[in-house]
Amino acid sequence: MDGYQNFLPIPPENNTWLLLLDDFSQLQQQQQQQQQQQQQQQQQQQQQQQQQQQQQQQQQQQQQQQQQQQQQFPQQYTNDGINVQSIESNNYLNNNNFNFNERLESLQKQQQEQQTQIQQQLQNYQQQYQDQYQQRQQQYQDQYQKPYELPSQYIDQCNQIFSNYNNNNNITSINYNMNNNNNSNNSNNNSNNNNNNNNNNNNNNNNNNNNNNNNNNNNNNNNNNKTTDNINNVNSINNLNNINLGANNVNNNVNSNVVSNVNNNAISQNKPIFPPFNDNPINIQQQQQQQQQQECYKIPQYKISLDNTNNPIITPTITPTLTTFPTITPTLITPTTIAPITPTPTPTPILTTTTTKTTKINLEETNEKTKIINETKKQEKSTESIKKMNQNKASRNYRQKKKDYIKEIEDKLSLLEMENSKIQKENQTLRKTGSVDLMKPSNDIMKMMTDCKTITNQLKLSLERNDDRSLIYLLHQYHRVIEERYSHIEYEAEKVANPYVQLRLSIVGYTPGQFCPFVLNIFNDNNDDGDNQKVTNDHNWYNTFKKEANITPEQSNKLDSIRFQHTKVSASMFKEIQMLDLEIKSFFYKFIFSYPSDPLSSLNPTELVYNSTTTTPIDSYSLPAIDKQLELAGKLESLKNKLTLNGGLMLDTFSSISSLLTPRQEAIFLVGVDPYAFINFSHFDIINDVWSNIINKPFSGPVHMAQSLNKMFNHS
């Protein structure tokens, strides 16, 4: 123990009371936890006891209920205590459920049958309505849509009725003559007097028959209003005047006034005398009575004989009877001589007989004529409308074309005005500055050159690091920067082809070089310092590039073919450019500068010395002819085109070479031979300074003109 106490740490004297407090607090906490646990256990025990008591109470209640039921209904329970009533009730419910399902099925069937019956009834109703509708349509067609019947048909029917009646009664036809009002005879007057006497004697006997005749006349009038009449028959009836009947020996039971009344009614209405046609339905007895009454008073159909002959005239004799209808017996009468009638012209129309066939043909012809007339009118209207439409379209098109033409001319004039204003501004600037600003490179070209130079430097670093991803990214960026290189070349060619620039170049004695330095860098060694060191072998740089880039033999063959094509095309272009340059300078020497026509023959290069007295200024000479000016403009335009083609050839060779190479090989190629990266901007400043000094110097003649001319003509 002593050894153990030696290892215990000795607490400091000042902190002993803190340790005691900690121990006391821990003891209190333990006591509290124990008390809480005991309380929880007691609560759980109490809950369990309560649950047990509740279960016991429920069991007791159930037992009491069963005992009460057994006391009330002892028959329902067996000896074993099974409830028989509950079993029976369950069976009853099951049976009721089965019956209920059957009833449901029967009700559903009844509903279906009712639905089918209703549908059948609806179909029957629909059929009935359709049948009724069809019947009504047929009735309407029968009543109102009958075919058109000519009036001549009714006349033929009436004549048939009269002929049948005459044949049945054996009445012979009576010949009567038409007499004019101007030519009257004594015999006719005698017969008329006899008839009048007979009529006066028989007036009293025939009063009873007047009522029947009036009724018949009313029926005839009603029927005549319904039927259509023929105009020719009416005219024939109007012409009948003074009908004479020889009835001296006849007992007249029939009233002669009836005939006159009937004729007067027919003539007053301008209608023929026909039997009545009653369309209205009547009784059979009434119809028979009317027929009997009408048969008594019907007038037979008469034939008109205009020829005056002595043939005997047969007149009917009527036997009077009271109870029966009159019977007609023919009697012979002695003929009376009648004076011949001289025909006199009357304004009455000529009688014309028409048949149903002729009327139908005439109607068809009229219908066809009306159709043709209507069609011609429609065609004329349509042609007129089409002509108007075409005229309107033509006028609209003409106006639209006129507007478009005027608009095109206005656009062209506006463009010409813009170009003229631009040229005037350029001329004013050139007069002030002397085309110094024109020879300076544009800001876009300077920016493109600086961007290409930075990209080539980055490519060089990525090649040293062997970073392929950065190489691909930089190559894409390089091609994006040089997208507008063709437009820059065209802009620079326009600057060179300017007449002011060519004038200054001819003063200086500039001649274009045989090869462009950018194109030479493709196959020759590159000199960063720009010194005049010449390389004996043209393929020195090209061979080193093949070794560094590990070019395959297929690639080398393709590159050789590209080189051959490039040299061939560039040589032909250079010759054309050189010829144009000589022609332009000869124009300036002949028409602008004051020198002899053949300077080489009269002057030697050593003897020619600059002297201001031998020359005259440009302003003292007149301008050349318009033809010569136009020739100069055409040559300058062709020079511009050739320069743009030469620059495009250079760029096309670079793009074709880059398409054959891999990204790493292309990067090596651009680092070695980039036309934009190896340009020194200080050279541009030097050229501008020299150019400004030449322009600002007073001009009286070209400097060392003889030497420049010798160079120019020796090249040719």
UniProtKB/Swiss-Prot annotation:
What residue spans carry the region label Disordered?
A: 173-233
Q: Name one GO biological process term.
A: regulation of gene expression
InterPro entries on file: bZIP, bZIP_sf
* GO CC list: nucleus
Cell compartments where the protein resides: Nucleus
Decide whether keyword Nucleus is in the record.
Answer: yes
Sequence segments annotated as region (Leucine-zipper): 406-413
Sections of the chain in a coiled coil: 20-142
Looking at the record, the residues that make up the bZIP domain are 381-444
State the Gene Ontology terms under molecular function. Answer: DNA-binding transcription factor activity; sequence-specific DNA binding
Q: Where is this region: Basic motif?
A: 387-403
Q: What does the UniProt keyword field contain?
A: Coiled coil, DNA-binding, Nucleus, Transcription, Transcription regulation
Q: Which SMART domains match?
A: BRLZ
Name the predominant localization.
nucleus
Q: What's the stated role of this polypeptide?
A: Probable transcriptional regulator.
Q: Which family does it belong to?
A: Belongs to the bZIP family.
Task: Name the chain's protein.
Answer: Probable basic-leucine zipper transcription factor O
